[in-house]
Amino acid sequence: MLSDLDIAQAARLRPIHAVAADLGLTDDDIERYGRNIAKIDLAVLQRLTDHPRGRYIVVTAITPTPLGEGKTTTTIGLGQALARLGKRSVVTIRQPSMGPTFGIKGGAAGGGYSQVVPMEPFNLHLTGDIHAVGAAHNLLAAMIDNHLHHGNRLDIDPYTVSWTRVVDISDRALRQVIVGLGGKENGPVRQAQFDITVASEVMAILALTTGLHDLRQRLGRIVVAQTRDGAPVTADDLKAAGAMTVLLKEAIKPNLLQTLEGSPALVHCGPFANIAHGASSVLADLIGLHCADYVVTESGFGADIGFEKFCDIKCRASGLAPDAVVLVATVRALKAHSGRYAITAGKPLDPQLSEENPDDVAAGVANLTAQVRIAKLFGRPVVVAINRFPDDFPSEIEVVRQVARDAGAFEVVESFVFAEGGAGGYDLAQAVMAACEMPGKFTPLYPLDMSLRDKIETLATKVYGAARVEYTPEASRQLTRFEQQGYGALPICMAKTQLSISHDPKLRGAPSGYVFPIREVRLAAGAGFIYPLAGDIRTMPGLPAHPAAERIDIDADGRTVGLS
């Protein structure tokens, strides 16, 4: 089979104005970046206010292996299938960071015959939004150190500065640095760090904002440090938020691309899913819902982490609620959850994974059962999509199908969208359209007036399967301080591994009865959530021994090769 890049480069793309017209957008509504990419002016939201709202579908998954289970591919393939059935559909997905693109995971444009194109700019720079986020973030960092250098009028305690610097490349050497070396003219010496840009609170803010003025207010609320008296210091206190907003004036506009089959795709924002909420922008979804019959979006990683945050954070920010949920499962991942196989990114797969073994699938299906249960907590029907691989066997598929039905899935269908594009997603599309018509009420997991500790314990026990939560003394002090400072009504955005429903990536399947540890609690006041840290979560990845960057090059004709 052709590589993803070969397929993408062979595609005949429609002019972007024609793609926009499918959504009812005019030339005045878009700002073109060449023939195949455009930004959408936010004024369309005012013009389309009276349009009926389309159906809202969110794609999630079982706990993934490091290789991923095809969630983005399924999202795109479902959008293509709906379009083939004569529905006006649009997919809304995240823009990938260049860190994973050059590292282990590769790009995030989907795969096979269900991709967003043009693939190269999608994975590299696109319209520069991530760079704008980095510039806004680093401007605030510079203004903090500048304030300390020029007298520290706000009486900031330098040891409490929590605002980092960012770069959109995985670079472990920058995780811990010393700034201010070389004499007084370079500012006070202090320990600092770099994060990858998509872990920035600015990225989370951009993804959750509902407009330019809301963006300005959110940026102003960012807390960067404490005074020596313990009061929070904000970006507004430093008079940085206005300039940060100006840097993001273009980045706030969603990007319009297309799928391989020419249907519209909105690509916007890319917050980390295990640190932030891990979903594409509220604005892209709002525009899509005013323009299309069906909007298909995705949440990060498994239902325990990405879908829960989608419901408890993103839906609260947008005022929207999903009509149906698609949960992607693979035979490969369920075999891995049996504990009998190790899947490591960058290493060859165990050949036995390709052999027929329904018993191994049955040994790992507890994760599927748990993730369907988690997805159903929020009140909407769940369609399980079995993402088919060529080496799957009917006996293994039947195990997955039966377990998903027993877990309460509305429907279980096989998906062939990787190999067949939209044509391989007809059954999935039909099931999803039927699910959207089901009665039921969307319900967040917890009320916002619940205490921070009670919210955390609700997540740990109802979603992660823990028996109880254990806090370090520092985490307990931080929770008390945040509530005293007036942040107690914020939702929780748990920072934890994506490789297990628990905090420990080694715990496969559906762990239960364990102690869920919280070692630290941080505040993202601008984004509007509290994020406790459970386990070892890195905000700056490192490159593997053989990063994907080694394979990427230019051929004799100037075409990109090796990008995946």
Swiss-Prot record:
Annotated catalysed reactions: (6S)-5,6,7,8-tetrahydrofolate + formate + ATP = (6R)-10-formyltetrahydrofolate + ADP + phosphate
Enzyme class: ligase
Alphabetical list of Pfam families matching this protein: FTHFS (PF01268)
InterPro entries: Formate_THF_ligase, Formate_THF_ligase_CS, P-loop_NTPase
The keyword Metal-binding is annotated on this UniProt entry: no
Keyword Metal-binding in annotation: no
Pathway where it operates: One-carbon metabolism; tetrahydrofolate interconversion
GO biological process: tetrahydrofolate interconversion
Residues annotated for ATP binding in this entry: 65-72
PROSITE patterns linked to this entry: FTHFS_1, FTHFS_2
Alphabetical UniProt keywords: ATP-binding, Ligase, Nucleotide-binding, One-carbon metabolism
Domain of life, per lineage: Bacteria
Enzyme Commission identifier(s): 6.3.4.3
CDD domains reported in the protein's UniProt record: FTHFS
Gene Ontology terms, MF aspect: ATP binding; formate-tetrahydrofolate ligase activity
Record-linked HAMAP family: FTHFS
Entry similarity comment: Belongs to the formate--tetrahydrofolate ligase family.
NCBIfam families in alphabetical order: PRK13505.1
Record protein name field: Formate--tetrahydrofolate ligase
